[in-house]
Every structure is written in C-alpha cells, then in structure tokens.
Swiss-Prot record:
The active site is at C150, R156. Its main location: nucleus. Transmembrane segments: none annotated. It comes from the Eukaryota. Residues 247-258 have a biased composition (Polar residues). This is RNA/RNP complex-1-interacting phosphatase. It is found in: Nucleus; Nucleus speckle. The gene is Dusp11. Keywords: Hydrolase, Nucleus, Protein phosphatase, RNA-binding. It comes from Rattus norvegicus (Rat). PROSITE patterns: TYR_PHOSPHATASE_1 (PS00383), TYR_PHOSPHATASE_2 (PS50056), TYR_PHOSPHATASE_DUAL (PS50054). One of its GO terms (molecular function) is protein tyrosine phosphatase activity. Substrate binds at T151, H152, G153, L154, N155, R156. It holds the Pfam family DSPc. Belongs to the protein-tyrosine phosphatase family. Non-receptor class dual specificity subfamily.
Length: 326
C-alpha cells in the first residue's frame, strides 16, 4: 500500500473551544490567493516565469471582475510581455482548479503532485529538473518559456525554480532566491524552504556559473539593488495530510498519460506598494558591466522588456529512461 495515497491524518483530541475547520468546497477560492499578483516576469537568463494557479470559470462567481485569473487570462498576460509559453509545470496537490483541456493545444503540460508547506522530496526535485532539461533540449532553437505554478506561485514554485538554478546552473543560493523574489513580485515566505536552499552547495565544475560569470547575461534587472524581506511563515513544515513518498512515474500526471503540447503572459502595471519591485530601468547599456548582488531599500519601479538567453541552456542533460510522447 502506498502511504502517499492511503495515509490518513488524525486531529486527535481537541481540548480547545475552537470548532474543527470546515471542509473546503470544490468551488472555494484558495486561501490567500487574492493576495498575490497573477503573473511575475520572466527571470533574466532563464526560461522560467512564475504565476499563481489560474482558476476555471466556475470560480468567477466568487470573484470581482478584476480579481479573475483564468487560463485565458494567463495566456493574455504572457503575450503582453511579448513572450511565448511552451510548458506549464503544475505543482498543486489537487485537480480542482482548472482542466488541461482549458489550455491551448500548443502548450505542454506536466503535473507534479507536490505537498505544500514541507520541502519537496528528492523524487519531486528529480522530476522537476528532468522535465525542465527535456523541454530545453527539445526547444533549444526557440525562446519559449517554462511557466511554473503552485497555488500562489511562490513557495513551492520558488523553491523548485531556485533549486534548479543552484543545482544545475551553478547559481549561488542567495542570488537565486533574490532573482526569483524580484521577478515574482513577492518574496518566498516559508523559512524552511529558504534555509534548505541556503544550505545547498554550488557545483564548482559548472561550465557557466550563473551567478559568477557568463551564465546569465548582464542586465539592469540584475544590477539593480533590491530590499527583500523574507518573513517566515510557519517556520517548521506542517504535518501533511498525506505522508510518505511516491515513485517518480506516479508523480507526473498528464492528459492521456502523455505530455500534451499546448501555448501562452503579464501586465506589469499591477506591481503595488509593499511588493518586491520589478526589474530596473530600461534603455541603459549594461553590456560592459558585471552584475552583483547587494541590498538597498526602495528599488526602482521601472520595467524593461529585454530578453535574456543563458548559454548554459544549450547543454541539456536528460536521463535515458524519460519518455516524452508527442
């Protein structure tokens, strides 16, 4: 029996006056979902873009018009950035938010069931890296993006993107976290995720170290100083309703047991006071400058639209056991 699927969570005796939490309905808006920007910006030097989970039409009755964020809205917002989405990696631990059929057929979709609050296990990390590497290998002659989301597009999403940049691209942990925070418009909140990333050792034999040499192209975004406040949220991992591990082949769920190819965006004016500012001023030539990381409050609120391509993405690796059905 697989503990992942059949484990049960017991509240035990409750000696407080609090009523037990109500079971969430299928059409309930995810908790705190409204607090986050729908879509971030492309992370310079990478193919990554992060966003919160889009919600299908049945949720719209409980949202104001300006709060709605559907798969179609996602497509439009990424097009507004003059970008093209090639792959969605869905990290939510449910199937209720939207259907794969709602996505354009030109976009690939991969679901990696990832439990919230706790640091993703090695199987989940391996699947994420493998999916990214395979996509990059198959799309090395174009500039399509990899969109990653969990519920809020922040903690699980930020952890796995940063983990890839650290382990595969050789970026320093603090640099990866800082880059993600700036481009997402929010900071990774969970302290256990941050601490786990900061313990990672940078591989010294990378051909292109993203945070030290030519792995990432220099940009106003990377040289701009930014003030980041990573406030802990529930420092330790919460007890999961489901425990144990799931084998790699069971983690990935796709339509018809294959990766369906499907295609997709962001309004930069939605950055608000209190969020991490978007990339720095456009129109300046930083080609001769070496980027660095430092801390300063009140970073620039300007945006830019330049694309950044990392040379390291021309050297993908992928295990022979992986299958990608077209």
């Amino acid at each position: 029996m697989n503990q992942w699927h059949y484990g049960r969570y017991s509240r035990g005796r409750d000696f407080t006056a609090r009523a037990p939490p109500k079971k969430k309905g299928k059409n309930q808006i995810p908790e705190r979902w409204k607090d986050y920007l729908p879509v971030g910006q492309r992370m310079p030097g990478t193919r990554f873009i992060a966003f919160k989970v889009p919600l299908q039409k049945k949720f719209e009755a409980k949202l104001m018009p300006e709060e709605c964020f559907s798969p179609l809205d996602l497509f439009n917002k990424i097009q507004e950035q003059n970008e093209e989405l090639g792959l969605i990696i869905d990290l939510t631990y449910t199937q209720r938010y939207y259907k794969v059929e709602d996505l354009p057929k030109t976009i690939s979709y991969i679901k990696i069931l990832t439990v919230g609050h706790q640091v993703p296990d090695s199987g989940t990390i391996f699947q994420f890296k493998s999916a990214v590497k395979e996509f990059l290998k198959r799309n090395k002659n174009n500039d399509k993006l990899i969109g990653v989301h969990c519920t809020h597009g922040l903690n699980r999403t930020g952890y796995l993107i940063c983990r890839y940049l650290i382990d595969v691209e050789g970026m320093r942990p603090d640099d990866a976290i800082e880059l993600f925070n700036r481009c997402r418009g929010h900071c990774i909140e969970r302290q256990n995720y941050i601490e786990n990333l900061q313990k990672r050792r940078v591989r010294k034999n990378q051909n292109a170290s993203a945070s030290r040499s030519g792995g990432l192209e220099d940009s106003a975004h990377l040289t701009e100083q930014v003030h980041t406040t990573n406030k802990p949220v529930n420092k330790g991992p919460k007890k999961s309703r489901r425990g144990g591990h799931l084998e790699s082949s069971q983690h990935v769920q796709t339509q018809s047991s294959a990766y369906s190819f499907r295609k997709w965006s962001q309004n930069q004016s939605v950055y608000q006071r209190g969020f991490v500012p978007p990339p720095g001023p456009a129109g300046e030539d930083y080609s001769q400058r070496r980027f660095f990381w430092s801390m300063r409050p009140n970073g620039s609120q300007a945006t830019h639209h330049k694309k950044w391509i990392a040379a390291s993405y021309q050297r993908p690796f992928y295990p022979a056991s992986w299958e990608w059905n077209v």
